[in-house]
Amino acid sequence: MRKTTLLLLMLLLCSSTTFMTSCSDRKDQLPALLERKKVMGPDEEKSTITTTYNKAVEALKKDPNDLKQYITLASVFISEGRITGNNSYYSNAAIQMLDKVNDKTTGNMDLVFQSLSLRSAILLNMHQFKDALACAQKGAALNSMNAGIFGALVDANVEMGNYDEAVKDCDKMMSIRPDLRSYSRASYLRQIYGQNAGAISAMKMAVDAGLPGQENTEWARTNLADLYLNTGNLDSAALLYRSSLVYRPDYPFALIGMARVEKTKKNYDGALDYAKKAIQARSEVAFVSLLADIYELKGDAAKAKETRNDVIALLQQGQDDEPKDAMVKHNVSREMATAYLNAGQPDKALSYAQTDLNMRPDNIDANELIAWIYYMQHDLTNAKIHADKMLATKTQNAATLYKAGVIYSAAGDANKGSQMMHDALAINPNVYQVMNLENRNLATIK
């Protein structure tokens, strides 16, 4: 089993080292568009990306000072990274291109703006949220009528916990260009503020605004399915995940969504099959963590423990393998904290969670993570402090409310804790399955 697990998990790192070496050694060469090792999306989508890349490369061979082509290549790398999940390679490739375009190399401020806009997207993707916000703010100062830069501001302000600012930025984005990108952000903000029905409505608009089969449309469709899943509507969630798999076969986020549906239904063998297919399509730490949860629920504690420990080892290896001169590094503090917590090592988890929280002290997700870690350490005073903060936006996420209820009950506020757990069950009757409560020694309501 360990050999099989490691084979799956090695996909987490196999695509993250090639470019990091070549880029640092040959900064003047154009990064390659790597050959995909598997089918990912429609052939015409791949063909468009390849053609755009080749045209830009040929243009730069004729005129190395054609700065527009560096913007084009950066856009290509960002798109390819999103589709393939090879974020380390393509984020650094894109940054290398954008470094060619700044106010010192061109008097064209529109190109500078485009460079800032793309750079902010890369920094967000690599979880460098503070830098992403500063970059997006510079971009907005150059062009206040571009919807994309306000999308970056929404994302960065959400991650930094500046939720009121994010709402203002989203309103501005919607006024400029109501489309899939703006509708999906409106949905996420409504979810943050506890408006689950409104979040579903906005995400439906996002799906309707997209072209079926394209990655961004299927991302929106699977996020809509997630909203249904998290509010207890398994049938609607499954229908959307399956629809996404028809429009975009083997789409990893639809596969992992089906794994969650089957897990909730306690069909653990089916869940395991979907989770493994998702990992083979695209390795994500969250996917492998779900795999471990499924093993745990199947009663195979040894496989669950083994898988969780492998996640830690591979995340650490990824950090160790990252060159010191990498143009942009992936901040994995949250991922490491979650991995250690899932592996039953809350003391180590706390160190990484504190690093994450120090960067964004008002972010509700960062507060939720550290609150749960403190609870696992039996530090109920600090757990309650951060439970208060994680509820600041009045979220109606069932798992979040249930965790808060457990914390408040343990801290001595039984009435408040019980009410929150009841509220969580009213939102999602399947919250026990979401949190694996059957196999964990946590408070439950029967």
Where are these regions (language model features)?
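N-terminal leader/linker segments that initiate helical-solenoid repeat arrays
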Residues: 20-114, 134, 168, 419, ...
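Start-of-helix register in tetratricopeptide repeats
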Residues: 68, 75, 114, 148, ...
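Canonical tetratricopeptide repeat
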Residues: 72, 114, 118, 152, ...
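Short coil turns that delineate tetratricopeptide repeat
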Residues: 64, 106, 110, 144, ...
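Residue-level recognition of tetratricopeptide repeat
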Residues: 75, 79-82, 121, 155, ...
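Canonical positions in the second alpha-helix
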Residues: 59, 100-101, 138-139, 172-173, ...
